[in-house]
């Protein structure tokens, strides 16, 4: 009753005897998921990292006494985060490479044996990232904001667009077939290529770049939200 699903999902599970529980309870992961060895490299660790970040105090995630580890098949199927989620939270999760854990492929201290053991969410083969921010307190024509980034998520920066716009600045909309710093797409790819090869030296600069782009994005959205609010007041039927 708490989740969206197909109207006939219960009938489908019963017809094909898919519920594997002994007590009649339903675990969707057991019914429709998998526990392959590959999951313990590509999927389960990523879910562990996300839940660890969004619910750091709900469970013990690290150490010998951890409630859940990167290879736990019984990770919570869904959770309510400990606080409201921001655009920056989503960006961090989708850029994750197990920062602060022994599994960070960019790690430079501690035990090296487990670095890169699990596939990161933010890897150097990322090419595009987008998230939709729905703002219920805004008018319909400016309620959704789409945040977009190009290149590797570990090094890229999100820029915001009103979802209803039909044109965007040349620097942002033109990818070109030629590698160049004259557009946002290739600039993002170039930053990632250089920073990936010199992570520890580049991290400080990359983080400052990401923070400044995000701050400018929020500043622009706030500025034009205010202008649009004046339009809505003067033209209430708009």
Give residue ranges: language-model regions:
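Long, compositionally biased low-complexity segments
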Residues: 44-54, 58-103, 107-117, 121-126, ...
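Helix N-terminus capping/helix-initiation residues
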Residues: 17, 85-86, 151, 234
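Residue-level detector of conserved catalytic or cofactor/ligand-binding positions
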Residues: 231-237
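Exposed alpha-helical structural elements
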Residues: 8-11, 27, 37, 44, ...
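Substrate-recognition/cap regions that form aromatic- and gly/pro-loop-enriched pockets
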Residues: 107-225
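Extended, regular secondary-structure scaffolds
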Residues: 1-80
């Amino acid at each position: 009753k708490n989740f969206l699903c197909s109207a006939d999902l219960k009938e489908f599970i019963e017809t094909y005897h898919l519920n594997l529980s002994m007590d009649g309870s339903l675990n969707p992961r057991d019914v429709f998921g998998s526990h392959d060895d590959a999951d313990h490299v590509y999927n389960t660790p990523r879910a562990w990292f996300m839940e660890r970040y969004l619910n750091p105090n709900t469970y013990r995630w690290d150490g010998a006494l951890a409630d859940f580890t990167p290879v736990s098949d019984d990770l919570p199927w869904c959770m309510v985060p400990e606080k409201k989620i921001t655009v920056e939270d989503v960006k961090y999760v989708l850029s994750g490479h197990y920062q602060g854990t022994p599994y960070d492929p960019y790690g430079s201290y501690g035990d090296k044996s487990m670095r890169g053991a699990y596939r990161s969410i933010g890897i150097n083969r990322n090419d595009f990232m987008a998230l939709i921010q729905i703002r219920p307190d805004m008018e319909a024509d400016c309620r959704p904001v789409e945040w977009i980034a190009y290149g590797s998520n570990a090094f890229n920066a999100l820029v915001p667009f009103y979802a209803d716009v039909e044109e965007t600045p040349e620097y942002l909309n033109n990818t070109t077939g030629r590698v160049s710093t004259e557009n946002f797409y290739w600039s993002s790819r170039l930053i990632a290529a250089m920073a990936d090869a010199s992570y520890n030296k580049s991290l400080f600069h990359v983080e400052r770049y990401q923070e400044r782009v995000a701050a400018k994005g929020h500043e622009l959205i706030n500025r034009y939200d205010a202008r649009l609010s004046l339009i809505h007041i003067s033209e209430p039927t708009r």
